From Swiss-Prot:
Gene3D superfamilies: 1.20.5.1300, Nitrogenase molybdenum iron protein domain
Protein family membership: Belongs to the histidinol dehydrogenase family.
Role summary: Catalyzes the sequential NAD-dependent oxidations of L-histidinol to L-histidinaldehyde and then to L-histidine.
One Gene Ontology molecular-function label: NAD binding
Catalytic activity, reaction form: L-histidinol + 2 NAD(+) + H2O = L-histidine + 2 NADH + 3 H(+)
EC assignment: 1.1.1.23
Pathway terms, separated by semicolons: Amino-acid biosynthesis; L-histidine biosynthesis; L-histidine from 5-phospho-alpha-D-ribose 1-diphosphate: step 9/9
Binding site for Zn(2+): Q261, H264, D363, H422
One GO cellular component term noted in the UniProt record for this chain: cytosol
Name of this protein: Histidinol dehydrogenase
Any Pfam family the entry gives: Histidinol_dh
Originating organism: Psychrobacter arcticus (strain DSM 17307 / VKM B-2377 / 273-4)
Residues of the active site: E329 (proton acceptor), H330 (proton acceptor)
Length: 431
């Protein structure tokens, strides 16, 4: 795992190189995805079935067989071990409670002319959620995508999840039942995104697609944007852990927080930033100790080698500057007084405050969404939320008397834009 210091002459270029990562602009990938989308768009069910058999070796012989019944979801939930069922319910309850606070309501006000202005908030009609599949799948992703949609008032939530060789993690199905997902199709990849975007004879077209996936899913979401809305183009997951070498810090905790990200994927990114050279050394040692016995050590080791970094900064100000430059998906502030740093953080997907708040809690059960902007997009993007499943319409009502002064203003401006019909339309209201 490489080490950098802000005092290095080439620090800026080294950091830029580490942060540079793009998987969805590969020409071959884009050509493949465009071909899949075109085939699904024109071939419908038969192409979806063919590609699912080809890529996932799914045993289904009809597209209808790719859909799971609500009874199957309920059975998966009922058969859960009591401890696991309780944990899933706890997570779902907390996610729902948090997201209920995000609901936006319609509002109106009357201006000084007696005109009524406002904003109408409406839930989307139908959304599609993509959930990574197989045995190593993530029921938490079901909760984080479906629950905000339901809280927003979405009428129908369609879930797609790949099932290699027809095999699915029962916990994913149980989560779909708990989150009140309306329909579940065992399809994945670019073909699933295309089916959701354009619809087939069996799979209904949706208004928006959310949820993480591999590079083919990300490229497909980018390609269908405009036909449907999307939440974001998700890149590899990342964490930045910040500490200052305080007495209460534990190097083994910090190391494990970094490794919890690195074990996700060989292209995941774990970054440690500290003001203490001694702490940097201690964390490096603890990482090596943990790698000796972690089940996914091979994945974590590759991740740390390829994209991990330990960064030494001179002071807190430099630390905050590095954080805002990285704009991490997950940011842990492992310090005594994290609130003192909050106003200095401008760019981060989720901020984990204090050393008793590891990213892992946020991933599963804290309540805020774990679908977060990656690859520096926290500079301009937000976590998935209820607001992603609601849209807004402006409300404008002008009374007869209130219309006249506004029409005069519109008339003048329209003339200066050389739009005569606009000007006359306004003029008719006051002459």
């Amino acid at each position: 795992m490489r080490q950098l210091s802000t005092q290095d002459a080439d620090f800026d270029s080294q950091l830029t190189e580490l942060l540079a990562f793009e998987t969805v602009n590969d020409a071959t990938l884009l050509t493949t995805v465009d071909d899949i989308i075109a085939r699904v768009r024109h071939g419908g069910d038969s192409v979806v079935l063919e590609l699912t058999q080809q890529f996932d070796q799914h045993p289904a012989t009809t597209t209808q067989a790719l859909e799971l019944s609500k009874e199957a979801l309920a059975e998966a939930f009922a058969n859960l071990d009591d401890v696991v069922k309780s944990a899933l319910i706890t997570a779902a309850t907390r996610v729902k409670t948090f997201h209920e606070r995000q609901v936006q309501e319609t509002w109106q006000y009357e201006d000084e002319l007696g005109n009524r202005l406002g904003q109408k908030v409406t839930a989307l009609d139908r959304v599609g959620i993509y959930v990574p599949g197989g045995l190593a799948s993530y029921p938490s992703s079901v909760l984080m995508n479906a629950i905000p949609a339901k809280v927003a008032g979405v009428k129908e939530v369609i879930m797609v999840v790949p099932a290699p060789k027809g095999v699915l993690n029962p916990l994913v199905l149980a989560a779909a039942h708990l989150a009140k997902v309306d329909r579940v199709f065992t399809i994945g990849g670019a073909q699933a995104v295309a089916a959701l975007a354009y619809g087939t004879e069996t799979i209904p077209a949706v208004d928006k697609i959310t949820g993480p996936g591999n590079k083919y899913v990300a490229a497909a979401k980018r390609a269908v944007f405009g036909q449907v809305g999307i939440d974001m183009i998700a890149g590899p997951s990342e964490v930045l852990v910040y500490a200052e070498g305080e007495a209460q810090d534990r190097a083994d905790w910090l190391a494990m927080d970094l490794l919890s990200q690195a074990e996700h994927d060989r292209i995941a990114q774990a970054i440690f930033v500290t003001t203490s050279a001694q702490q940097l050394k201690e964390v490096a040692i603890e990482i090596e100790k943990a790698l000796a016995e972690l089940p996914k050590a091979d994945i974590a080791r590759d991740s740390l080698k390829n994209r991990g970094v330990l960064i030494l900064v001179r002071d807190r100000e430099e630390g905050m500057a590095v954080i805002n430059r990285v704009a991490p998906e997950h940011l842990e502030l492992s310090v005594d007084h994290p609130d003192a740093l909050l106003n200095s953080i401008r760019h981060a997907g989720a901020i984990f405050m204090g050393r008793h708040t590891p990213e892992a809690i946020g991933d599963y059960c804290a309540g805020p969404n774990h679908v977060l902007p990656t690859s520096g997009t926290a500079r301009f993007s937000s976590p998935l939320g209820v607001y992603d499943f609601q849209k807004k319409s402006s409300i404008i009502y002008c009374s007869e008397s209130g219309s006249k002064p506004l029409a005069q203003t519109a008339d003048i401006l329209a003339q200066h834009e050389d739009l005569e019909a606009h000007a006359r339309s306004a003029r008719y209201r006051y002459q």
